[in-house]
Amino acid sequence: MHKIPKGTALAFDFGEARIGVAQGDAELGLSHPLATVTGGSNDEKFAAIAKLVQEWQPRYFVVGLPVHTDGTKHEMTHLSRKFGRRLNGRFNLPVYWVDERLSSVYAESLLSEAQVFGKKRKSVLDQVAAQAILHGFFEGGPAECFNGREG
């Protein structure tokens, strides 16, 4: 268990091609899909993220940390950590990494129940996965905080 920080959060489901983004507030117990950042260079992706940061004024970030179902590191684990450190470096906000093992499965299931398919599904899948990551964080799942210092 971890103490849930107060205030607005932005959560990220990081991928090399697409980054799903969700927004929420633990005090209200609400989170919602927000955007999918796609294509372009890292600078272009971070410019799009900067616009979301400007608009939503988060107090912290939550980044999904991919691991295999048995808990071992995934090939994307290192890249997600690097992404989180870059968020911290660019915006000087704490980053909480959370296990995202089942976020995509949850997102797929939710979208199937809502009968969202095809191009629409692809456009929102990463956002809904980010929402699942944020919801898990709000529910008190295990998290690791990074605030600009390796330790």
Swiss-Prot record:
Its EC number is 3.1.-.-. NCBIfam families: RNAse_H_YqgF. The lineage of its organism: Bacteria, Pseudomonadati, Pseudomonadota, Betaproteobacteria, Neisseriales. Belongs to the YqgF nuclease family. Keywords: Cytoplasm, Hydrolase, Nuclease, Ribosome biogenesis. This is Putative pre-16S rRNA nuclease. One of its GO terms (biological process) is rRNA 5'-end processing. It comes from Neisseria meningitidis serogroup A / serotype 4A (strain DSM 15465 / Z2491). Its main location: cytoplasm. It is an enzyme of class 3 (hydrolase). SUPFAM superfamilies: Ribonuclease H-like. One of its GO terms (cellular component) is cytosol. InterPro entries: RNaseH-like_sf, YqgF, YqgF/RNaseH-like_dom, YqgF/RNaseH-like_dom_sf. It is found in: Cytoplasm.
